[in-house]
């Protein structure tokens, strides 16, 4: 016992000296950059040394940035304190960061001491990038925080509790170029709220509660996101100055009509998906269809000129609306259109309107070819109710390379081919019986075609002759019968083929020798043997999952020994006694 008492002072001295010794920081550090992300810090690390310019302190438990002497941080330019528990920032601390350019404070509690914090922010004279997202800030709080940041260029106020943008909220930030206000509760933007922001180029107002945008006057904007609001009306200001807007996202709103953008000559990307647009034809406007009443409806005038100024639009998304017709005249005014989506609408017929708004039979040309030819290269029409595409349809799309017609009810027509290259003689087109099938032959520029889930039960001979397809999707057509001649004409072009989920047995899946086929999906069928036509194809990827295969023919594997890179075989009743092919 005496010995233990004699040793106790020595033990205590050793312990105290160990506690006094500074602990090594669990941070990644270089001369100018330090990252202490997610290391459990509860206070600002003062002992990081001189010359640090980049400091990352996100995902910690720091509550205060106040009353601290910060030696060595006079050179700091970038500070990230997102995802902490920060609620207090003092002027004393910020005064020691004269070179700070970027301050990221997202996902903290800056609503709690906003007035004192906002006063401290007045010392951030050189700040250019500020993130105040997800801090439970109301409109007046956000305005107070930025009330003296005259050099600010990028501001993130997303995921807060702002309900309005009052006049003057941005008067002190005239150099602002990018502004994120998404995921708030903004219902009102007072006239003149953005008036001071003459350099503003990018605005994100997605996921708010806006009902109407009228007199839109931000002519200098390049990118505007208004998706996921409750907009029924979007009307730009009728001024002489053109808009510089290039990207406009109005998706997931309640728009009843195509927005009026007469001066948006530089617009290249327009997203109108997930709205309530039922027609693109002139004269379809009826004010009573609006849920709310707007004084702007009196001058809302729908004509063919609605899209006349959109000469640079290359990408237009109208998917998931209520369109019933495909109006060629409307899209013709979009002279630069490359990608068009009308997926998930109510299309049953391709619009048969003439230039005089009359209706003509679908098997006749609806108007002179030069008045309606589209420049579209990619067209998405999946998930509609289209039964037939008239024979002139592809003539009006001479640049078309990709078309998705999945989940419709189209039946390809037969075309008679003579040679392996797919040449058609004059008059060889087989007429569509009663206009019930769609001619996919002789479309020379078409490269990618999807006809999945079209209830196709029989593929006619030479259905794609003189159409040099690179990829063809025929999946989801249960019970499909495909004779050997069905893909005649594709021997020298087809590289990717999907016959997935067709429940085809051996007698229904005959393939010609496809000299360029690299990717083949035969999964979800009832095959016990592979089609022999495949053996001459230079396959790189083969999917035969969920069939009735007992083995893979050795002849096929030998043929593919130098090309095959991956094969999927799960879900087949392979015999364990005949797996020698695995060694091939």
Model-predicted segments: where are they?
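Leucine-rich repeat domain C-terminal region
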Residues: 108-118, 211, 222, 232-233, ...
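Recurring C-terminal helix/loop segment of individual leucine-rich repeat
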Residues: 43-47, 65-71, 89-95, 116-122, ...
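Solenoidal tandem-repeat scaffolds enriched in leucines and small polar residues
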Residues: 111-300, 311, 320-322, 348
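N-terminal signal peptide
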Residues: 4-24
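Leucine-rich repeat
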Residues: 30, 50-52, 72-77, 96-101, ...
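LRR N-terminal entry segment and analogous cap-like coil->beta motifs
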Residues: 29-67, 73-76, 421-428
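Consensus "Asn ladder" position of solenoid repeat domains
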Residues: 39, 60, 81-84, 105-108, ...
